Amino acid sequence: MSRNRKLVHTVVVPIRWGDMDAMGHVNNTVYFRYMEQARVDWTHAFARRLGRVAYAGDGPLIVNASCTFFAPLTYPGKAEVRMFLGVPGRTSVESYYEIWMDGKKYADGAAKLVWIDMKTTRPVPLPEPLRALLDIAETAPSPTPADAKPS
C-alpha cells in the first residue's frame, strides 16, 4: 500500500448475518461492498462540502479494485473501514482501504478512481478542491529496509 496517502473517511459497517457464507465467515465479495460503502459515503460528504450533489455532472468511476485478506470477519460485529486517497494524477487517484474490527486489521483494499463526466463517461481533470484536500507531497517515499543504506 502506498505510503503517500491521506485518510479521508472512516465508516463503521455492521456485519449482517446475510454477509456470511457456508464457511461461517463474511464472504469475500462482501469486503468489496464494505469498501464501496466507505467510498460512496465519502463521495457524498465531499460533494456536500462543496455545496454540490454527488455524481451530478462528474464523479469517480472505478477502473480496477483489489483486496488482500488477512483474517476472516465473522458475525456479529462491526467492521471499521478506513478510506485513504493517494497522490492525484491528472484524471485519477488511487484509493486505499483498511478493514478493522476490535483493533485487528482484517483486510487491505485498493481501487483506482478515474474522475469522469457523467454524461459523456469520458475522463475529466480531478476537481481542484479534491487536489487541495489531498495536498500530499509528491516526494519519493521513505526508504524501505531493502533500500536503506547502512549507517
What are the residue ranges of the model-derived segments?
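Terminal targeting signals and extreme-terminal segments of soluble enzymes
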Residues: M1-E80, G86-S151
